[in-house]
Amino acid sequence: MAQPSFFQSPPPTTLAAIAAAANATLVDASRGEQVITGLAALDEAGPMHLAFFDNLKYADQLAMTKAGACLVSPRFEARVPSHVAVVRANQPFRAFVQLARTMHADALRPQSWFGCDGISSQAIIDPSARLEDGVVVEPLAVIGAHVEIGAGTIVGAGAVIGPHVKIGRDCNVGARTVIQCALIGNDVLIHPACAIGQDGYGFIFFGPGGHVKVPQTGRVIIQNHVEIGAGTTIDRGSLRDTVIGEGTKIDNQVQIGHNVTIGRHCLLAAQIGLAGSLTIGDNVALGAKVGINNHLTIGDGAQVTAMSGVKDDIPPNGRWGGFFAKPTKQWFREIVAVERLVRDQTATNKDEGQE
């Protein structure tokens, strides 16, 4: 449930109004004036809360819930205890999220931690920087020469924006984030402690005089509506740019190497490592801790399971996993085959009196 100390409490709302807002149906219309004051999980909800149920894994929690009302699909409607008002929705979780986005709009993107509504007197801003009206700069942030920042953007405490960086409108740059050599679009959310635009890992290795550093003269381009999780690092390109496509959502602690191109509306879970010069298509989903070798192409719509190591190109809409990654059907068949070999060998050893 939402904590009042961190987020605003929503106004009390009747079940009739909630059902209408969620495009759902209140099964017992006589309970339309029942008041709900917040949203909560089944096992934490009280009589004033709305919960949701859409997975039999939580059937025990549904049976024991003290919630005042529950969003539920027609399939599971009969499982709701009699004391809980049933709000029928074809997709309960989507309906729940729709309500949450309305009731807790302040939780959708970070606000100023210090209640700033302008530029803090403790910020350092180069005179040549151009900030549109409505930019918020928190204490101890540093903004370099010739930086441009659009209206509605918040620059968090201790963030550093290097020379000539351009940041669009309605963005959020988290506290202690460092940005250089980057062009950033509108409505980009960058969580705290990210590093964007530092030089990539480019060397000529093991020469006569050791490792020779290769100049990294490209940029980082981040398109509109991208979200970047805390602690993520994105290296600038060596010659061509590192590009993050529109609408892509990146989790915490992801490393993106130089010259990587990521398409639109991709999903990257935590602790992924992408080596340099990768090309990733649109609508690609990568599970947590995936590692991908350099100079590969991952086709549109591909999916890779968590903790996989990718050393080959993946075709469009491919479903791959494992180490090294391969099509999931092949991977599963190999796992079954290995388990069968181990089982058969164990049985043979027992028959022969071996441990």
Swiss-Prot record:
Enzyme class of the recorded protein, top EC level: transferase
Protein origin, superkingdom: Bacteria
Catalysis: reaction(s): a UDP-3-O-[(3R)-3-hydroxyacyl]-alpha-D-glucosamine + a (3R)-hydroxyacyl-[ACP] = a UDP-2-N,3-O-bis[(3R)-3-hydroxyacyl]-alpha-D-glucosamine + holo-[ACP] + H(+)
Biological process according to GO: lipid A biosynthetic process
GO CC terms in record: membrane
UniProt GO MF annotations: N-acyltransferase activity
Pfam families xrefs: Hexapep, LpxD
Record keyword Kinase present: no
Protein's UniProt keywords contain Oxidoreductase: no
Annotated signal peptide: none
Biological pathway: Bacterial outer membrane biogenesis; LPS lipid A biosynthesis
EC number: 2.3.1.191
Active site: 258
Keyword terms, alphabetized: Acyltransferase, Lipid A biosynthesis, Lipid biosynthesis, Lipid metabolism, Repeat, Transferase
Self-association state and partner proteins as the record states: Homotrimer.
HAMAP family: LpxD
Family: Belongs to the transferase hexapeptide repeat family. LpxD subfamily.
Function recorded in the entry: Catalyzes the N-acylation of UDP-3-O-acylglucosamine using 3-hydroxyacyl-ACP as the acyl donor. Is involved in the biosynthesis of lipid A, a phosphorylated glycolipid that anchors the lipopolysaccharide to the outer membrane of the cell.
Name of the protein in question: UDP-3-O-acylglucosamine N-acyltransferase
Naturally occurring in which organism (per UniProt): Bradyrhizobium sp. (strain BTAi1 / ATCC BAA-1182)
